[in-house]
Amino acid sequence: MLKLLDFSLRLSVIPLSVATIWLTVTNKQDNSIYGYLKYSDLTGLKYMVFISGICASYAFIAAVSTWIRCIVTKTWLFFVSDQIVAYLMVTSGTAVLEILYLAYNGDREVSWSEACTSYGKFCYRMKLAVILHALALSCFIILAVISAYRAFSIFEPPLVPSKVVEEDRA
């Protein structure tokens, strides 16, 4: 059951990440006042595309690897890799969320006005990409918990001497 859930989550991440990449890379809008805006103008979006590519590639390799017996026994490899990918996804998602926040609200202290009134389509597509990225991240958080369970369930719980237990009760 756990193996099927693991495999399904890894497969689910692939289309979510690919859709995130597609929405972001094809995101562009022209404005007669401010000019042409495309995803490559914003470093945070380029970072999210890069991390989404890593995420989709790793999810594919890991999904295939879950059915190869010699690799499945390497629970620590999956545990560490799932943690790293989840953390990378958090960093890229928060970078784009910061861009979205500034695009919608601006920053009066540094005289930045909001951009989404002028680039509504661009902001909408960026929001959709962040939502898809968050769904992929949710899958990886669950995968990180599953891989942690697998990695740590092979150990016995520590034995507590009976003397220590008696002192704690007193």
From Swiss-Prot:
The membrane topology of this protein is: Multi-pass membrane protein
The residues that cross the membrane are 5-25, 48-68, 84-104, 128-148
What keywords tag this UniProt record?
A: Cell membrane, Membrane, Transmembrane, Transmembrane helix
Coiled-coil positions are: none
According to the UniProt topology, which residue ranges lie Extracellular?
26-47, 105-127
Tell me where it resides: Cell membrane
List the ranges whose topology is Cytoplasmic.
1-4, 69-83, 149-170
Recorded hits in InterPro entries, A to Z, give:
CASP/CASPL, CASP_dom
Gene Ontology CC annotations of this record: plasma membrane
Pfam families, alphabetized: CASP_dom (PF04535)
Assembly and interaction partners: Homodimer and heterodimers.
UniProt lists the family membership as follows: Belongs to the Casparian strip membrane proteins (CASP) family.
Name of the featured protein: CASP-like protein 2D1
From which source organism is this entry?
Populus trichocarpa (Western balsam poplar)
